[in-house]
From Swiss-Prot:
Lineage: Eukaryota, Viridiplantae, Streptophyta, Embryophyta, Tracheophyta
Protein's name according to its UniProt entry: Unknown protein 4
Length: 8
């Protein structure tokens, strides 16, 4: 889960 990344 992250604003920029799709991984986590």
């Amino acid at each position: 889960p992250s604003a920029t990344y799709f991984v986590r």
